[in-house]
């Protein structure tokens, strides 16, 4: 499809349904082919798409480059950079739409490629908000995976924290000793099982005004949670009566 703005270009991209065997291989490159006026130029142009979208195959055709441009110049070319930005924005927009319109199909896609896309969260780029828009995580209070916005909307806490715990699998994390206090207080905790999350969460630190906070590192203060606050605001005679009943 056309990618807009002043540059004349078209791109035909595909969302794969299964992982390529070399997805995590260090030498894995993107699978995009670049054409200029329908003449093939290169299929080894790393700057055409971010590494964390390397699983997206397709073709890009532009009229804004010379047919005899060298590969070295292509790697740091303003037109290529514009095309890369436009392609990336379009892919992320389509993924956000897929999540909204076909959640089951998106979930299958996310299980295969979510960890790769989240590599983009520990890179310096302008796409973090778009990635967060559709990124989903396991959590302690629901069986299905949730977005960070869902966490905030459904389980907002007065500490302005997004609590998480990381480990090898969901079951072990749910049975972790550190989880007991949070379960007792009905505080939702993200269950982080993708190794990539342990890289970007400490770096990102915040989502909107909420801090990412590991429940296994340092002291987590829950004393001012809403339930505790409600109890502390009760009149003294009510507290005495409750204590008597206990």
Which residue ranges define each predicted feature?
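Conserved GHKL (Bergerat-fold) ATPase module
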Residues: 1, 5-246
């Amino acid at each position: 499809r056309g990618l807009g703005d002043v540059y004349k270009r078209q791109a035909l991209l595909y969302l794969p349904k299964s992982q390529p065997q070399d997805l995590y291989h260090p030498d894995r490159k993107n699978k995009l082919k670049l054409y200029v006026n329908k003449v093939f130029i290169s299929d080894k142009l790393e700057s055409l798409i971010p590494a964390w979208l390397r699983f997206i195959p397709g073709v890009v055709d532009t009229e804004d480059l010379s047919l005899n441009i060298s590969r070295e110049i292509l790697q740091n070319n303003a037109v290529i950079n514009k095309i890369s930005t436009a392609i990336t924005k379009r892919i992320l927009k389509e993924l956000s739409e897929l999540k909204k319109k076909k959640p089951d199909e998106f979930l299958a896609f996310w299980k295969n490629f979510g960890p790769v896309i989240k590599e983009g969260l520990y890179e310096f780029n302008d796409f973090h908000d778009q990635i967060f828009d559709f990124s989903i995580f396991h959590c302690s209070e629901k069986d299905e995976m949730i977005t960070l916005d869902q966490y905030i909307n459904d389980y907002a806490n007065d500490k302005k924290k997004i609590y998480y715990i990381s480990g090898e699998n969901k079951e072990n994390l749910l049975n972790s000793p550190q989880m007991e206090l949070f379960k007792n207080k009905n505080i939702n905790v993200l269950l982080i099982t993708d190794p990539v999350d342990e890289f970007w969460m400490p770096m990102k630190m915040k989502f909107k005004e909420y801090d990412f906070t590991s429940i296994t590192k340092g002291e987590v203060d829950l004393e001012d949670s809403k339930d505790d606050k409600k109890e502390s605001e009760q009149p003294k005679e009510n507290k005495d009566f409750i204590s008597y009943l206990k």
